[in-house]
Amino acid sequence: MDTSRVQPIKLARVTKVLGRTGSQGQCTQVRVEFMDDTSRSIIRNVKGPVREGDVLTLLESEREARRLR
């Protein structure tokens, strides 16, 4: 692992559950708002149970999921 450009771990709160995704519906697409910068929100895919108000630990905060169709 290249430790020269390691991003800090970010905390994000789930603001809206958008729907299920994946070939068998195993992931949930959610909109998250960063705890340190509340004006910034992105869409992520989450594996496992999740609901609005949950706090996620994002190891990689720049990647955004594609929207559901």
From Swiss-Prot:
Gene Ontology CC annotations of this record: cytoplasm; cytoplasmic side of rough endoplasmic reticulum membrane; cytosol; cytosolic small ribosomal subunit; extracellular exosome; nucleolus; nucleoplasm; ribosome
Residue positions, PTM N-acetylmethionine: M1
A single GO molecular function term of this UniProt record: structural constituent of ribosome
Alphabetic keyword roster: Acetylation, Cytoplasm, Diamond-Blackfan anemia, Endoplasmic reticulum, Nucleus, Phosphoprotein, Ribonucleoprotein, Ribosomal protein
Residues that span the membrane, as ranges: none
Cell location: Cytoplasm, Cytosol; Cytoplasm; Rough endoplasmic reticulum; Nucleus, Nucleolus
Modified sites of kind Phosphoserine: S41
Entry superkingdom: Eukaryota
Function: Component of the small ribosomal subunit. The ribosome is a large ribonucleoprotein complex responsible for the synthesis of proteins in the cell. Part of the small subunit (SSU) processome, first precursor of the small eukaryotic ribosomal subunit. During the assembly of the SSU processome in the nucleolus, many ribosome biogenesis factors, an RNA chaperone and ribosomal proteins associate with the nascent pre-rRNA and work in concert to generate RNA folding, modifications, rearrangements and cleavage as well as targeted degradation of pre-ribosomal RNA by the RNA exosome.
Subunit composition and interactions: Component of the 40S small ribosomal subunit. Part of the small subunit (SSU) processome, composed of more than 70 proteins and the RNA chaperone small nucleolar RNA (snoRNA) U3.
Family: Belongs to the eukaryotic ribosomal protein eS28 family.
Disease: Diamond-Blackfan anemia 15, with mandibulofacial dysostosis: A form of Diamond-Blackfan anemia, a congenital non-regenerative hypoplastic anemia that usually presents early in infancy. Diamond-Blackfan anemia is characterized by a moderate to severe macrocytic anemia, erythroblastopenia, and an increased risk of malignancy. 30 to 40% of Diamond-Blackfan anemia patients present with short stature and congenital anomalies, the most frequent being craniofacial (Pierre-Robin syndrome and cleft palate), thumb and urogenital anomalies.
Protein name per UniProt: Small ribosomal subunit protein eS28
Primary gene name: RPS28
